[in-house]
């Protein structure tokens, strides 16, 4: 009754708080598993020379296909609840084999993405790289558990010259939490980048042009 007085959204009643929390966990874990499948299927498609984006669109023509795109899994829900579930299951002497496998796949994704960027940079002889987006998902300043940080650090580990631009995030908080200096305004972005990689789909990036550099999105790596 309290929620219905303060929320405009429909309120779904559960018989107990345990049911409600377990349902929310199920939703997050299911998405983690589906993204892991998309990531693994994308790898298969790439090995076959097939475009995963077109495959996904075609498959989505069937009404009951769960349209999930491959990508990085960060944030404070999807990649976190999975560990709560596995710990709870372990306490009950149960194993969540599928869930654990999905988590391994998604945890490996940042390193894989960094390797793809590095290889592409070598292919086009790019000396300077700009990453677009730092938050864990599009159109939010929230950087909790963002996997862009892992991609950035992996690229730096390979001694590449890399900057990251995100006009939505709190740069001081990013510096404190991750030790990474983020470019916050478009005016600060230099014009001598050879490769620009969009990792987060902020709408604001649609209004910007990077005509002097090779531009690529995460989904096209």
Where are these regions (language model features)?
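Structural/interface elements that position substrates and couple domains in central-metabolism enzymes
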Residues: 1-221
